[in-house]
Amino acid sequence: AIFQKKIEFKKLGLIIIDEQHKFGVNQRKKLSDKGGKNCDVLLMTATPIPRTLTMTIYGDMDLSIIREKPKMRKPVKTYSKLENNIDDIIRFIKKEMNLGNQIFWVCPLIEESKKIDHQSAIKKYEYLKKIFPNQVSLLHGKTNIEEKEIILNKFLNKKFSILVSTTIIEVGIDFPNANVIIIENANKFGLSQLHQLRGRVGRGFKDSTCILMFKSNLSDNAKKRINILKNSNDGFIIS
């Protein structure tokens, strides 16, 4: 809302932009221009976009890297699995649930599409709740605000174990007890988005796991992206 031309500030002195990779360079410039020459800008992100790194190299930005994570946090272990190995994943989930852990299951679409061969969140929710009765809930972009808050509060209070969702959980979600995230059609996501989604787990002191699901016919670029995620938890390396 504050990017609009009609929005003016009396004396804008500091702009702090979190999740800066969500904004384009021009968007950030428009906002900083509202403050004039005396306005400072602080950008924060876990995964800088390549163009931002280029700006840093050329001296337009000072860079501070915080490599240390909060104490007790462990690196998220990342694995890749073919979609036809879903039975193995289900067995793994059962084991985690028996340990009292919670799971995110992310799908790229809300509903089935005749044009795109992706698993939908609704279809996966229906599938999982048959296997895990009363332990699965669904969240997506069409969920109204009140219902979303109810679902997230129930998940926080461990009223159910599996949250099936679209990428709506990519940012602003902090559930230390959730230590497993499964991402379907992982080859269709960019590195930055996959890294952000993976960051929804590993926020507690337990071992955490990210499983990237994909079909067998991957392109070379898709294989490369998945391998990068499997081999690194460092946002700067990934970018």
Q: Locations of the language-model features?
A:
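Inter-lobe coupling/hinge segments of SF2-like helicase ATPases
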Residues: 1-227
